[in-house]
């Protein structure tokens, strides 16, 4: 199929490989009547296959619409689907848009009394089925809507539909990453080169909180084990090492003063030979040798 885009906006081989690897072309078994122009064929198992060429054309069209908005803060990106929470937050952080990740508060576009009231010039939603409340309120106040649409998505009140798989974490993250990159390229923020943007597509993928917590615990345990190993005493030295203690039968160093004389004010070390007979002084000058009995 011949692309209607200028050569500079045409998809590269790497972009097509990314779209196929993320399974952005895999649709559902159901197909809405208005989504039929974007369907390439239907597999034997009933799954509809989307046309990747039309996906890229609509992606570039949406990027050119977004880049035409002067104030980036007038763009609102919405995702009530959990797989799109991280993607819309990263998109908003890189392009300056407002992000609503999670439940959309009813009245955010129509009730000016609410704290979450917004007046965007354009909104981008991840799934028209899940984000139907935001699309309906946008239709009340004439806000254009760009949506990531699967084959079973209703296109009512949707102005620009990007045909893609909006059910998996990789396809959602990749489309938001490509959209953010194309917007920055059209604004002139980054060059149109393969290595012009240093943000990896992995940063837009959803991560399970339990997996993140488990990974953090493993990293903390590894750091604790490394710190404990560094604090261990060197080999050959331990608290049970008695090589530095005085040998049996020698004079206690605590009794010896600086001049080499015995210091009797120090604690008595006691006899060195515990197997010898005890000798005590019985009188003023006489010495008696104690015996083992009373006689």
Curated annotation (Swiss-Prot):
<feature type="compositionally biased region" description="Low complexity">
    <location>
        <begin position="273"/>
        <end position="289"/>
    </location>
</feature>
<dbReference type="GO" id="GO:0022627">
    <property type="term" value="C:cytosolic small ribosomal subunit"/>
</dbReference>
<keyword id="KW-0963">Cytoplasm</keyword>
<comment type="subunit">
    <text>Component of the small ribosomal subunit. Mature ribosomes consist of a small (40S) and a large (60S) subunit. The 40S subunit contains about 33 different proteins and 1 molecule of RNA (18S). The 60S subunit contains about 49 different proteins and 3 molecules of RNA (25S, 5.8S and 5S). Interacts with RPS21.</text>
</comment>
<keyword id="KW-0689">Ribosomal protein</keyword>
<feature type="region of interest" description="Disordered">
    <location>
        <begin position="262"/>
        <end position="295"/>
    </location>
</feature>
<feature type="region of interest" description="Disordered">
    <location>
        <begin position="222"/>
        <end position="244"/>
    </location>
</feature>
<dbReference type="GO" id="GO:0003735">
    <property type="term" value="F:structural constituent of ribosome"/>
</dbReference>
<dbReference type="InterPro" id="IPR023591">
    <property type="entry name" value="Ribosomal_uS2_flav_dom_sf"/>
</dbReference>
<dbReference type="InterPro" id="IPR018130">
    <property type="entry name" value="Ribosomal_uS2_CS"/>
</dbReference>
<dbReference type="InterPro" id="IPR001865">
    <property type="entry name" value="Ribosomal_uS2"/>
</dbReference>
<comment type="function">
    <text>Required for the assembly and/or stability of the 40S ribosomal subunit. Required for the processing of the 20S rRNA-precursor to mature 18S rRNA in a late step of the maturation of 40S ribosomal subunits.</text>
</comment>
<dbReference type="GO" id="GO:0000028">
    <property type="term" value="P:ribosomal small subunit assembly"/>
</dbReference>
<protein>
    <recommendedName>
        <fullName>Small ribosomal subunit protein uS2</fullName>
    </recommendedName>
</protein>
<dbReference type="InterPro" id="IPR005707">
    <property type="entry name" value="Ribosomal_uS2_euk/arc"/>
</dbReference>
<dbReference type="InterPro" id="IPR032281">
    <property type="entry name" value="Ribosomal_uS2_C"/>
</dbReference>
<dbReference type="Pfam" id="PF16122">
    <property type="entry name" value="40S_SA_C"/>
</dbReference>
<dbReference type="GO" id="GO:0006412">
    <property type="term" value="P:translation"/>
</dbReference>
<keyword id="KW-0687">Ribonucleoprotein</keyword>
<comment type="similarity">
    <text>Belongs to the universal ribosomal protein uS2 family.</text>
</comment>
<dbReference type="InterPro" id="IPR027498">
    <property type="entry name" value="Ribosomal_uS2_euk"/>
</dbReference>
<feature type="compositionally biased region" description="Low complexity">
    <location>
        <begin position="222"/>
        <end position="236"/>
    </location>
</feature>
<dbReference type="Pfam" id="PF00318">
    <property type="entry name" value="Ribosomal_S2"/>
</dbReference>
């Amino acid at each position: 199929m011949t692309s209607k885009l200028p050569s500079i906006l045409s998809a590269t081989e790497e972009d097509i490989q990314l779209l196929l690897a993320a399974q952005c072309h895999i649709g559902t078994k159901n197909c809405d009547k208005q989504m039929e122009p974007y369907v390439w064929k239907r597999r034997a198992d009933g799954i509809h296959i989307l046309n990747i060429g039309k996906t890229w054309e609509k992606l570039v069209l949406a990027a050119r619409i977004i880049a035409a908005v002067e104030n980036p803060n007038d763009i609102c990106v919405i995702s009530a689907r959990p797989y799109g929470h991280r993607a819309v937050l990263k998109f908003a952080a890189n392009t300056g848009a407002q992000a609503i990740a999670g439940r959309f508060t009813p009245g955010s576009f129509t009730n000016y009394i609410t704290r979450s009231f917004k007046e965007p010039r354009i909104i981008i939603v991840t799934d028209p089925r899940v984000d139907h409340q935001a699309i309906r309120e946008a239709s009340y106040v004439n806000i254009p809507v760009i949506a990531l649409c699967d084959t079973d998505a209703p296109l009512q009140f949707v102005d620009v539909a990007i045909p893609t798989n909006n059910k998996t974490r990789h396809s959602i993250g990749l489309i938001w990453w490509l959209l953010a990159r194309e917007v920055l390229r059209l604004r002139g923020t980054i060059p149109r080169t393969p290595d012009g943007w240093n943000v990896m597509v992995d940063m837009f993928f959803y991560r399970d909180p339990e997996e993140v917590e488990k990974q953090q615990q493993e990293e903390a345990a590894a750091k604790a084990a490394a710190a404990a190993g560094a604090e261990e005493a060197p080999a050959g030295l331990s608290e049970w090492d008695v090589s530095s203690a005085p040998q049996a039968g020698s004079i206690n160093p605590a009794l010896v003063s600086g001049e080499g004389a015995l210091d009797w004010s120090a604690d008595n070390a006691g006899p060195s030979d515990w197997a010898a007979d005890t000798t005590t002084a019985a009188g003023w000058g006489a010495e008696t040798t104690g015996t083992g009995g009373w006689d």
